[in-house]
Amino acid sequence: MSDLQKTIIEDLHVEPEIDPKQEIRTRVDFLKSYLKKHTFSTGYVLGMSGGQDSTLLSKLTQIAVNELNEENSTNTYQFIGMKLPYGVQKDADDVDDAIKFVEPSKVLTVNIKESVDASVKALDGAGVEISDFLKGNEKARERMKAQYSVAGAFNCFVLGTDHAAEAVTGFYTKHGDGACDLAPLFGLNKRQGKQMLVALNCPEHLYNKKPTADLEDDRPALPDEEALGVTYEQIDEFLEGKEVAEDSKRTIEGHYLKTMHKREGEVTLYDQWWK
């Protein structure tokens, strides 16, 4: 194992093995503790895509608010699951299945197409050409903007689905899906998240679904693994301290070094990590 691989594993707090039921309990308790500390808040908001990560975090969050309501004999605490399509979402059935599994306190739908298209048009009017890839970033940021608007209206915190297998590659939009108040899945790799969903009796098709950010119009439902040039299995093996093929290792470490700026806050005169 290289020194960089060791550093990455330590920085991302990845364990080679987990007890799924214990991880569920630990992360539910984390969500509960944060709300109990911040008494002005009523709960959490998260966009639900119908994929593994948002389904897992949504379920953990709903468990947390249900327990808080029961423990305090109230119905004040809530989880707001948001459907955030751009026009017509091709895998909308998966979102609906995730909602049935989670049973959120509240479900809101905000179609981001009009807002995204307006931003692209305004930028074009200013002489700024937005590529299809950059338009994908506009979609991610518009989704997060909508979540923060809803969170503000309901005195909630915004959750993010960032986990170790995503963080190591920086595979998210800066100030888009990478923005949040809490990231309760941090430290888990992809297969560990799947193990937790199995323990939660989640429908199999939701955690066996091929991961995709689905942000590009020209390449709809582009698989994450194709975009990254490495598989999640290889990423998980790397994060668990196992040996992986040298080309895969170089790809993962290359992503990590290139995306350091995404994992750090705004750079000040006193920061040294970038030098």
Curated annotation (Swiss-Prot):
Keyword Ligase applies: yes
Catalyzed chemical reaction(s): deamido-NAD(+) + NH4(+) + ATP = AMP + diphosphate + NAD(+) + H(+)
Family: Belongs to the NAD synthetase family.
Organism for this UniProt entry: Oceanobacillus iheyensis (strain DSM 14371 / CIP 107618 / JCM 11309 / KCTC 3954 / HTE831)
NCBIfam families linked to this entry: nadE (TIGR00552), PRK00768.1 (NF001979)
Presence of keyword Ribonucleoprotein: no
A GO BP entry: NAD biosynthetic process
Function text: Catalyzes the ATP-dependent amidation of deamido-NAD to form NAD. Uses ammonia as a nitrogen source.
Recorded GO MF terms: ATP binding; glutaminase activity; metal ion binding; NAD+ synthase (glutamine-hydrolyzing) activity; NAD+ synthase activity
Pfam families per the UniProt record, alphabetical: NAD_synthase
Keywords: ATP-binding, Ligase, Magnesium, Metal-binding, NAD, Nucleotide-binding
PANTHER family: NH 3 /GLUTAMINE-DEPENDENT NAD + SYNTHETASE (PTHR23090), NH(3)-DEPENDENT NAD(+) SYNTHETASE (PTHR23090:SF7)
Xref: Gene3D superfamilies: HUPs (3.40.50.620)
Official protein name in the record: NH(3)-dependent NAD(+) synthetase
Annotated positions binding Mg(2+): 53, 166
Gene responsible for this protein: nadE
SUPFAM superfamilies cross-referenced by the UniProt entry: Adenine nucleotide alpha hydrolases-like
EC number: 6.3.1.5
